[in-house]
């Protein structure tokens, strides 16, 4: 299954997470029923091309056991692995035990990151880690001056890089257009992790940017926000300003 077939949720707290999961499930419902006094007619199941998962960073203050119990309670089965749950220097035995623990909860680790890379040594470490973990997607934040070296690593390891954007909070990769301008002429395995909330807080139209750059969108972080400015706050899906019903339609249209 292609790594781009997963959507990551990047929510701040448990209440927001629960609301977001419920709202998105409603938006992507696969079965509808029409009832009468004598019969129930079910429409054919529509299989989605994408799945809802969890950004490991959402559980930065929680251990792996708590994280997995929460995912099970939310009926979520995909996790982007963060290094505070599986350290960058983990050996094969530790990685195997980690994957088994995820499997015990019905969870699959589909990517690693975000991993920040400020030197060539950190680029090497990040890609070697992704290979040992056994994933084909690395969510990363390499310094601009390292992109030539990162491109070599992408080719060497045959691992996709999804550069994570930061919105107005950091000067490094503030929005989708900035990432696009830095990867458009590079190896096609170099793309972005589109954080639709951060992107909008920078003043960029996240839905329009998805349409423009969808061929290089390998992962997404989902959050609603209250305003298209730095002052915008995270909000439960449906309580902010992002048009999620239209967003889901776009994911289907462009076969995310």
Identify the residue ranges that each predicted region occupies.
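Histidine-acidic metal/acid-base catalytic patches
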Residues: 2-51, 60-77, 131, 176, ...
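Active-site acidic/histidine proton-transfer and metal-coordination neighborhood
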Residues: 10-11, 16-21, 44, 65-66, ...
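Active-site beta-loop-alpha junctions enriched in small/polar residues
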Residues: 55-59, 82-86, 114-117, 143, ...
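Pocket-edge positions in alpha/beta enzyme catalytic cores
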Residues: 59, 87-90, 171, 236-239
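Solvent-exposed, acidic/flexible segments
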Residues: 60-64, 91, 120
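Glycine-rich, proline-tolerant flexible connector loops at the mouths of alpha/beta enzymes
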Residues: 80-97
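Non-membrane alpha-helical structural segments and their capping/turn regions in soluble enzymes
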Residues: 92, 96, 120, 124, ...
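Catalytic-core regions built around general acid/base machinery
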Residues: 94-104, 149-156, 246-250
């Amino acid at each position: 299954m292609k790594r781009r077939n997963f959507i990551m949720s990047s929510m701040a707290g448990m209440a927001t997470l629960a609301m977001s999961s419920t709202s998105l499930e409603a938006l992507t419902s696969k079965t509808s029923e029409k009832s009468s006094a004598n019969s129930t007619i079910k429409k054919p199941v529509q299989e989605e091309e994408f799945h809802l998962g969890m950004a490991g960073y959402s559980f930065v203050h929680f251990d792996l056991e708590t994280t997995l119990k929460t995912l099970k309670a939310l009926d979520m089965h995909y996790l982007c692995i963060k290094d505070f749950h599986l350290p960058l220097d983990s050996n094969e035995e530790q990685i195997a035990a980690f994957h088994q623990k995820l499997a015990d909860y019905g969870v699959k680790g589909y990517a690693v990151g975000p991993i920040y890379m400020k030197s060539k040594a950190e680029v090497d470490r990040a890609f070697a880690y992704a290979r040992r973990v056994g994933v084909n997607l690395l969510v990363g934040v390499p310094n601009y001056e390292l992109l030539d070296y990162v491109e070599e690593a992408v080719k060497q390891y045959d691992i996709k890089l999804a550069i994570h954007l930061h919105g107005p909070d950091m000067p490094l990769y503030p929005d989708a257009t900035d990432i696009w301008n830095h990867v458009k002429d590079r190896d096609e395995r170099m793309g972005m992790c589109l954080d639709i909330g951060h992107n909008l807080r920078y003043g960029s139209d996240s839905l329009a940017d998805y349409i423009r750059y969808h061929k290089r969108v390998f992962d997404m972080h989902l959050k609603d926000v209250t305003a298209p400015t730095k002052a915008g706050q995270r909000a439960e899906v449906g309580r902010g300003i992002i048009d999620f019903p239209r967003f889901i339609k776009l994911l289907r249209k462009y076969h995310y």
